[in-house]
Amino acid sequence: MSAPTQTTPVFKALTEASFSDSSLSEEAKQNALYWWNTSANDLARMLHQADYSEEVQRGFLSYYRDNICPRLGGKPDKDSADSGVGWDGNPLEYSFELKGSTKKKSVRFVVDLTELRPADHSNPLSMKHTQEMVDLLAEKTPNFDDTWYKVLKNWFVYAHLTPEEQTALIAKAGQQTSVIIGFDIYPKLTSPDQLPVMGKVYFPPCYVASDKGISRWQAVRQGIQSLPGVESFPNILSSTEIINDYLSEKPDSWQMGTRYLATDLVSPNKARFKVYMRCFDTSFEGIWDYYTLGGRIPNLDEDREKFRQLMDLVSGTTYAETRSKDDMQMGRFTSATGKLTAIYFNISPDNPYPAPKLCIYPSNFAKDDEVIAKGLDEWLEKYGWSDDTKSMEDQVKSVFDHRKLEETTGIFTFIGIGRKEDPTKKELSIQVYMTPELYRTPRY
């Protein structure tokens, strides 16, 4: 397989040495090379766009090449099982954290290492490859701690069941993704033998909910309440109950919109929980009400019109005109791959309220990715968030060249906007999420 023509100097140098001395079989080498030439090249371009040093690019991409690419299995084909990450079933999502919400632009990504290409029918909910990554992070990342991760793994992961029981649970839950692992890529190396990343793990609550006959939200709530020593962090418990109080006023169906509980792989006194929630109401007013938890999170109103304008601009007209007016169906609401605008709540031991973030999914109401990019750039320019050297449209075009943005939607997934970790502080944080569409367009 030839290397992609548009790439970065660091990626090109690492490609020349890729897998040549590996102990992998020839087939496994070709599979790993596929993921290297697609996903790793995407990330290399993103790191280049974000002005990471060559040292950090080399350190991270070497790790990705040697550890993640071989664990992603085969090239996508018609028989590939769907991951819950990409709308097309592919196992990857990337994001830019924009300059302004951090000291400089940064790159993050998540990957589903569940064995899906081909599917592992003997242990379909195994998180073997993800656990191998967690073990490697334990050796290579500063401040690693898996205290709460281990407890949550025992609560959310069902790999201990027989193959038949796992298959039945997958059918009931509606997806096969066991867990997802995420990486925040730091701007500098702390030492030559360390990885410049912070790891986090995302647990889908659908298996616990299906097994125990409870809602997905209650699966998350009970998981948090079961953590040993969590009573020492009253803000975590009180923030969880603020969300629960809001949902208790809604129809029961709303509690099935919880997609993930994510936690950082750091010590409990520093770990944050992120709860990803879909909103059953697709109107702006309904989404805003969820974002504020019905007014339970104070002092958010000054952001309301900024959010409305962002949703209008990325729609190409107005969100009110282009959004779906159809009644929400439960199958759509709980779909693993069908995406919806969502809210995630950052629960921290330091803050008495959950910090909300609106995750807009513009593909559901915009004509194409070019409309989304231009609308986003207009909003960033208006509110002083634009990059002085390059528009977001040009940056995304520099990362993805497998098709034109004006062809359709799909590259942009979510645009995240909300308060930073402390919801009482007024600074906003913005992320732009993208997926490589490798199930729709394998590229090679």
Swiss-Prot record:
The keyword Metal-binding does not apply. This is Prenyltransferase phnF. Belongs to the tryptophan dimethylallyltransferase family. Pathway: Secondary metabolite biosynthesis. The keyword Transferase applies. Disruption phenotype: Impairs the production of herqueinone, but accumulates phenalenone. One of its GO terms (biological process) is alkaloid metabolic process. Transmembrane segments: none annotated. It catalyses: 2,3,4,7,9-pentahydroxy-6-methyl-1H-phenalen-1-one + dimethylallyl diphosphate = 2,4,7,9-tetrahydroxy-6-methyl-8-(2-methylbut-3-en-2-yl)-1-oxo-1H-phenalen-3-ol + diphosphate. GO terms for molecular function: transferase activity, transferring alkyl or aryl (other than methyl) groups. It comes from the Eukaryota. It is an enzyme of class 2 (transferase). CDD domains: PT-DMATS_CymD. Pfam families: Trp_DMAT. Its EC number is 2.5.1.-. The gene is phnF. InterPro entries: Aro_prenylTrfase, Aro_prenylTrfase_DMATS. The lineage of its organism: Eukaryota, Fungi, Dikarya, Ascomycota, Pezizomycotina.
